[in-house]
Design a protein with these regions (language model features):
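N-terminal beta1-alpha1 ligand-phosphate binding loop
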Residues: 5-28, 32
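S-adenosyl-L-methionine/SAH cofactor-binding core of RNA-modifying enzymes
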Residues: 35-94
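Conserved RecA-like P-loop NTPase ATPase core
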Residues: 10, 65, 99, 132
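Conserved strand-to-helix beginnings and helix N-cap segments that scaffold or border functional pockets
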Residues: 21-25, 53, 76-80, 109, ...
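Short glycine-rich, acidic/polar surface loops and turns
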Residues: 94-107
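Hydrophobic/aromatic beta-strand patches that form the interior of the parallel beta-sheet core
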Residues: 11, 41, 65, 114-116
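Short glycine-rich anion-binding loops that position phosphate/pyrophosphate groups of nucleotides
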Residues: 16, 69-72, 100-103
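Structured adenosyl-cofactor binding patch, chiefly the S-adenosyl-L-methionine
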Residues: 106-150
Length: 150
Protein backbone atom coordinates (compact mmCIF):
# COMPACT_ATOMS: atom_id res chain seq x y z
CA UNK A 1 0.00 0.00 0.00
CA UNK A 2 1.28 3.47 -0.88
CA UNK A 3 1.37 6.49 1.42
CA UNK A 4 -1.84 7.93 -0.02
CA UNK A 5 -3.63 4.64 0.60
CA UNK A 6 -2.79 4.28 4.30
CA UNK A 7 -4.84 6.34 6.75
CA UNK A 8 -3.80 6.53 10.39
CA UNK A 9 -6.05 8.27 12.90
CA UNK A 10 -4.98 9.04 16.44
CA UNK A 11 -8.12 9.46 18.53
CA UNK A 12 -7.45 11.12 21.86
CA UNK A 13 -9.71 12.10 24.73
CA UNK A 14 -9.28 15.70 25.82
CA UNK A 15 -7.98 18.85 24.22
CA UNK A 16 -4.30 19.57 23.73
CA UNK A 17 -3.68 23.13 24.94
CA UNK A 18 0.07 23.42 25.42
CA UNK A 19 2.04 24.80 22.47
CA UNK A 20 5.11 22.71 23.25
CA UNK A 21 3.14 19.46 22.82
CA UNK A 22 1.50 20.81 19.66
CA UNK A 23 4.91 21.71 18.18
CA UNK A 24 6.35 18.27 18.92
CA UNK A 25 3.35 16.57 17.33
CA UNK A 26 3.42 18.90 14.30
CA UNK A 27 7.04 17.93 13.65
CA UNK A 28 6.16 14.22 13.53
CA UNK A 29 2.99 14.88 11.51
CA UNK A 30 5.18 16.53 8.86
CA UNK A 31 7.61 13.60 8.92
CA UNK A 32 4.72 11.14 8.48
CA UNK A 33 3.46 12.69 5.21
CA UNK A 34 5.54 10.44 2.89
CA UNK A 35 4.18 7.33 4.62
CA UNK A 36 0.50 7.88 5.32
CA UNK A 37 -2.44 10.23 5.63
CA UNK A 38 -2.31 11.04 9.37
CA UNK A 39 -4.87 12.88 11.48
CA UNK A 40 -5.62 13.51 15.13
CA UNK A 41 -9.20 13.58 16.36
CA UNK A 42 -9.92 15.00 19.79
CA UNK A 43 -12.85 13.59 21.75
CA UNK A 44 -14.43 15.76 24.43
CA UNK A 45 -14.08 14.34 27.93
CA UNK A 46 -17.42 12.81 28.87
CA UNK A 47 -19.30 12.43 32.13
CA UNK A 48 -18.32 8.75 32.06
CA UNK A 49 -15.93 6.41 30.27
CA UNK A 50 -18.97 4.79 28.63
CA UNK A 51 -19.99 8.15 27.12
CA UNK A 52 -16.45 8.76 25.86
CA UNK A 53 -16.40 5.25 24.38
CA UNK A 54 -19.60 5.93 22.43
CA UNK A 55 -18.03 9.05 20.91
CA UNK A 56 -14.77 7.21 20.17
CA UNK A 57 -16.59 4.30 18.47
CA UNK A 58 -18.11 6.72 15.94
CA UNK A 59 -14.58 7.59 14.75
CA UNK A 60 -13.08 4.09 14.54
CA UNK A 61 -12.05 2.71 11.15
CA UNK A 62 -10.03 -0.34 10.18
CA UNK A 63 -7.58 -1.88 12.61
CA UNK A 64 -8.18 -0.57 16.14
CA UNK A 65 -5.22 -0.20 18.51
CA UNK A 66 -5.76 1.06 22.06
CA UNK A 67 -3.03 2.21 24.40
CA UNK A 68 -3.57 0.51 27.74
CA UNK A 69 -1.10 0.21 30.62
CA UNK A 70 -2.36 -3.38 31.04
CA UNK A 71 -1.98 -4.18 27.34
CA UNK A 72 0.76 -6.21 25.66
CA UNK A 73 4.15 -4.69 26.44
CA UNK A 74 5.27 -3.75 22.94
CA UNK A 75 8.65 -2.92 21.45
CA UNK A 76 9.03 -0.46 18.58
CA UNK A 77 9.67 -3.39 16.24
CA UNK A 78 6.50 -5.19 17.37
CA UNK A 79 4.51 -1.97 16.96
CA UNK A 80 5.85 -1.64 13.40
CA UNK A 81 4.93 -5.27 12.77
CA UNK A 82 1.27 -4.55 13.65
CA UNK A 83 1.16 -2.03 10.81
CA UNK A 84 3.20 -4.16 8.42
CA UNK A 85 1.18 -7.36 8.91
CA UNK A 86 -2.12 -5.55 8.54
CA UNK A 87 -1.01 -3.53 5.50
CA UNK A 88 0.15 -6.79 3.87
CA UNK A 89 -3.38 -8.12 4.45
CA UNK A 90 -4.81 -5.08 2.66
CA UNK A 91 -5.83 -3.11 5.75
CA UNK A 92 -5.49 0.57 4.87
CA UNK A 93 -7.03 2.28 7.91
CA UNK A 94 -5.75 2.31 11.47
CA UNK A 95 -7.36 3.91 14.51
CA UNK A 96 -5.16 4.39 17.56
CA UNK A 97 -6.91 5.39 20.78
CA UNK A 98 -5.55 7.25 23.80
CA UNK A 99 -7.83 7.66 26.80
CA UNK A 100 -8.09 10.70 29.01
CA UNK A 101 -7.02 11.04 32.62
CA UNK A 102 -9.52 8.35 33.67
CA UNK A 103 -8.38 5.85 31.02
CA UNK A 104 -10.66 4.00 28.59
CA UNK A 105 -13.90 2.08 28.89
CA UNK A 106 -13.25 -1.63 29.49
CA UNK A 107 -15.62 -2.74 26.70
CA UNK A 108 -13.84 -0.48 24.22
CA UNK A 109 -10.50 -1.99 25.22
CA UNK A 110 -11.84 -5.54 24.87
CA UNK A 111 -13.25 -4.80 21.40
CA UNK A 112 -9.93 -3.47 20.06
CA UNK A 113 -7.81 -5.51 17.67
CA UNK A 114 -4.72 -4.71 19.76
CA UNK A 115 -4.22 -3.51 23.34
CA UNK A 116 -0.67 -2.29 23.66
CA UNK A 117 1.50 -0.70 26.31
CA UNK A 118 4.77 1.17 25.97
CA UNK A 119 5.67 0.38 29.57
CA UNK A 120 4.35 -0.04 33.07
CA UNK A 121 4.73 3.63 33.93
CA UNK A 122 1.75 5.97 33.70
CA UNK A 123 2.18 8.80 31.19
CA UNK A 124 0.13 12.00 31.21
CA UNK A 125 -2.34 11.54 28.34
CA UNK A 126 -1.03 14.68 26.61
CA UNK A 127 2.54 13.36 26.64
CA UNK A 128 1.25 9.99 25.45
CA UNK A 129 0.07 11.69 22.25
CA UNK A 130 3.62 12.82 21.50
CA UNK A 131 4.98 9.36 22.32
CA UNK A 132 2.33 7.69 20.13
CA UNK A 133 2.99 9.95 17.13
CA UNK A 134 6.74 9.45 17.48
CA UNK A 135 6.26 5.66 17.64
CA UNK A 136 3.99 5.73 14.58
CA UNK A 137 6.73 7.61 12.73
CA UNK A 138 9.36 5.17 14.04
CA UNK A 139 7.19 2.25 12.87
CA UNK A 140 6.97 3.72 9.37
CA UNK A 141 10.76 4.13 9.23
CA UNK A 142 11.25 0.53 10.40
CA UNK A 143 8.83 -0.76 7.74
CA UNK A 144 10.60 1.30 5.08
CA UNK A 145 14.14 0.37 6.23
CA UNK A 146 15.15 3.94 7.03
CA UNK A 147 17.92 4.74 9.51
CA UNK A 148 15.85 6.66 12.10
CA UNK A 149 15.39 3.57 14.32
CA UNK A 150 18.61 2.27 15.88
Amino acid sequence: LGAAEVKISLIAVGKLKEDYWKKAIADYEKRLKPFCDFEITEITEGKSLKEEAQNIKKKLKGCVIVFDIHGHMTTSEEFAEIFSLNMNRGVSAFSLVIGGSEGLDEELKKAADYRISFGKVTYPHRLMRVIAVEQIYRAMTIINNLTYHK
